[in-house]
Amino acid sequence: MSDIFQQYFLKIYWAKLFNSIKEDIDAALRLDPSARNHLEVFLTYPGIHAVWGYRVAHFLWKVKLKLLARIYSNWVRAVTGIEIHPGAQIGRRFFIDHGMGVVIGATAIVGDDVMIYHDVTLGARTNEAGKRHPTVGNNVVIGSGAKVLGDISIGDGVKINANVVVTKSVPARTMVDSSEFFVI
């Protein structure tokens, strides 16, 4: 009986993974004006490859194969330059554009339809056990170089501009920008 359950479970998992892959490619085509077709995105987008690697590693993490999940996610990081901890929780249609230097911590939670650019960190401000990484709502855009740090909440529809450091919760439908620069 357990073999039948395992086979059924794996069939469902692979069907969901395939659907997630298709949704991730569709999100890239919708969000990146330079993306020309499904095949190009499938073959050449390291952000997409990192997300798929995360989805496999997260499955391994959930079924208690944590060492294997960490080894696999480390390999994905070496190949893509993008580090997503397998314990993080990431929603549907997640898109990382360019991707190099992205770090997403173990207790981060990311909603659906989120887009982040290169060199973004969803990190901790402490090394204490427990929830220490941000929770990001749905339909959020995080610009390149932004750092979102600590156990904070980023509301739905937020846009965080480039190179902003966010250490406090942000309400829904808000734009976060650093102060204007000036010439001395």
Question: What residues fall within each predicted segment?
Answer:
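Intrinsic structural disorder
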Residues: 1, 180-181
